[in-house]
Curated annotation (Swiss-Prot):
Entry keyword set: Ribonucleoprotein, Ribosomal protein
SMART domains: Ribosomal_L15e
Gene Ontology cellular-component annotations: cytosol; cytosolic large ribosomal subunit; nucleolus
UniProt-recorded name of the protein: Large ribosomal subunit protein eL15y
Gene designation per UniProt: RPL15B
Length: 204
């Protein structure tokens, strides 16, 4: 068994005494640092490698802190216009996951880099922590690598803002395949619009 197998087994048993203590200490450390921090190497090397990370030039890892809880509607003094049924301010549920929010924040802050993937790292009562894998599309080590140079194409700018990363596709309901997922393609909204708009052909 290789070393990564042991590491992944450790992370599978998060409730073990070792991992509980380690995660608690790390959480305290993360709270003292800024919300977006560059790391020297990934905290979970086995997970990072599975998601596309390589320990070579052009690849970087950032840790992002996201506040837990629901999303409050950003209205001044709670003044919402419209019908009473739509006047909620609190108890609204954001339609995307915290992980996709973390990817978005990293992508906005680091505009010259491209988001490859991300994974869960830690959480406490107030925050969730994720590590984001990014690559530099201008670096020759990335441009000359046939396994990753697809991301250098301009069409992949800000994938995380358009729901094109793994987590973004999951939030859009595009993870599944087959006849059970016909109503998710090309998107849930497009299918709804097609099914709810009347198209009457002209009689000639």
């Amino acid at each position: 068994m290789g070393a990564y197998k042991y590491v992944s087994e450790l992370w599978r048993k998060k409730q073990s005494d070792v991992m509980r203590f380690l995660q608690r200490v790390r959480c305290w450390e993360y709270r003292q640092q800024p919300s977006i921090v560059r790391l020297v190497r990934p905290t979970r090397p086995d997970k990072a490698r599975r998601l596309g990370y390589k320990a070579k030039q052009g690849f970087v890892v950032y840790r992002v802190r996201v506040r837990r809880g629901g999303r409050k509607r950003p209205v001044p003094k709670g003044i919402v216009y419209g019908k009473p049924t739509n006047q909620g301010v609190t108890q609204l549920k954001f339609q995307r996951s915290k992980r996709s929010v973390a990817e978005e924040r990293a992508g906005r802050k680091l505009g010259g880099l491209r988001v490859v993937n991300s994974y869960w790292l830690n959480e406490d009562s107030t925050y969730k922590y994720y590590e984001i894998i990014l690559v530099d599309p201008a670096h020759n080590a990335v441009r000359n690598d046939p396994r990753i140079n697809w991301i250098c194409n301009p069409v992949h700018k800000h994938r995380e803002l358009r729901g094109l990363t793994s987590e973004g596709k999951k939030n859009r309901g595009l993870r599944g395949k087959g006849h059970n997922n016909h109503k998710n393609r090309p998107s849930r909204r497009a299918t709804w619009k097609k099914n709810n708009s009347i198209s009457l052909r002209r009689y000639r």
